[in-house]
Amino acid sequence: MNIFLANPRGFCAGVDRAINIVKNAIEIYGPPIYVYNEVVHNKYVVNSLKKIGSIFVKKICDVPEKSILIFSAHGVSKSILKEANKRKLIIFDATCPLVSKVHHEIKRASKLRSEVIIIGHKNHPEIIGTIGQYNNPNKKVFVIQSIEEICKLKIKDPNNLFYFTQTTLSVDDTNKIIFAIKKKYPYIIEPRKKDICYATENRQKSIKKIIKLVDIIFIIGSKNSSNSNRLFEIANKSGKKSYLIDTYKEIKKSWLNGVNNIGITAGASAPEILVQQVVNYLKIFYKNSVNIYQVDGDIEKTKFMIPKKLILKIK
């Protein structure tokens, strides 16, 4: 039995930063620490942080006044920030810096009162937070996730139009949508840099490499993780048996019948411990008759600093 491990896989710099912000805040201030939305979309991570004193909330009014509040890696709207400030909360922002970059861009479009097309999933926290950077977005900001939706757009001024994208989309699918948008709106203003993040792109490239080598692919990630779902879609479209799993406990023995080569990757919010647990499960299942191969991919050196307040407290 051969196991092929995709590289890079698992935590990206933004996820790593967000988790460290929560952990450091708990260490410095003591529990409880409140977190608005899941800090990252992974069950294992969220449950681990709950055990050490994190309380995850969906409403700012559920946070006691003057408590410590952390915004998730997906970012929040300006209205949420305003509400948190009204409650005199001590705020630490774990928004991924690459999401913050998109926020800055849409704020610029808002100042110009430009119309905006956002490519992304309407109900995803990142999109909700991004739309919330635009003042009075009604009839100004349009969210689409397919080429078919472009023809339904009612753009008033194609010469004063921007587009942005969610950071965790399929690179291939998004490029097709962008091509179609630019064909219909040739004067649309592009982001200064592409919005899909390096980690999303690298993990999609790495899964394409192992697809060619395996009979079955396990994508480790939670069902509400956008980037993990995109990895699953890529694998599934290839025709290979593909499974999105949170842990090794979800693996059914019947999936492994007649399988000689197994591929494993993990979404950007899934910790390496879950990968190793899957590998260990397979070792036991195949009675240690297993060869493990690391499939080379892009080397990631990006690191994001945690807020200065937390760094100063640690010192």
Curated annotation (Swiss-Prot):
UniProt organism field: Wigglesworthia glossinidia brevipalpis
Pathway listed: Isoprenoid biosynthesis; dimethylallyl diphosphate biosynthesis; dimethylallyl diphosphate from (2E)-4-hydroxy-3-methylbutenyl diphosphate: step 1/1; Isoprenoid biosynthesis; isopentenyl diphosphate biosynthesis via DXP pathway; isopentenyl diphosphate from 1-deoxy-D-xylulose 5-phosphate: step 6/6
Known cofactor(s): [4Fe-4S] cluster
Reactions it catalyzes: isopentenyl diphosphate + 2 oxidized [2Fe-2S]-[ferredoxin] + H2O = (2E)-4-hydroxy-3-methylbut-2-enyl diphosphate + 2 reduced [2Fe-2S]-[ferredoxin] + 2 H(+); dimethylallyl diphosphate + 2 oxidized [2Fe-2S]-[ferredoxin] + H2O = (2E)-4-hydroxy-3-methylbut-2-enyl diphosphate + 2 reduced [2Fe-2S]-[ferredoxin] + 2 H(+)
The enzyme's E.C. designation: 1.17.7.4
Main function: Catalyzes the conversion of 1-hydroxy-2-methyl-2-(E)-butenyl 4-diphosphate (HMBPP) into a mixture of isopentenyl diphosphate (IPP) and dimethylallyl diphosphate (DMAPP). Acts in the terminal step of the DOXP/MEP pathway for isoprenoid precursor biosynthesis.
Protein name listed in UniProt: 4-hydroxy-3-methylbut-2-enyl diphosphate reductase
HAMAP family: IspH
Binding, dimethylallyl diphosphate: 41, 74, 124, 225-227, 269
Class of this enzyme: oxidoreductase
PANTHER family, A to Z: 4-HYDROXY-3-METHYLBUT-2-ENYL DIPHOSPHATE REDUCTASE
Positions annotated to bind (2E)-4-hydroxy-3-methylbut-2-enyl diphosphate: 41, 74, 124, 167, 225-227, 269
Note on cofactor: Binds 1 [4Fe-4S] cluster per subunit.
UniProt superkingdom: Bacteria
GO terms of biological process kind: dimethylallyl diphosphate biosynthetic process; isopentenyl diphosphate biosynthetic process, methylerythritol 4-phosphate pathway; terpenoid biosynthetic process
Positions of isopentenyl diphosphate binding: 41, 74, 124, 225-227, 269
Binding site for [4Fe-4S] cluster: 12, 96, 197
GO molecular function annotation: 4 iron, 4 sulfur cluster binding; 4-hydroxy-3-methylbut-2-enyl diphosphate reductase activity; metal ion binding
The protein's assembly and partners: Homodimer.
InterPro entries: LytB/IspH (IPR003451)
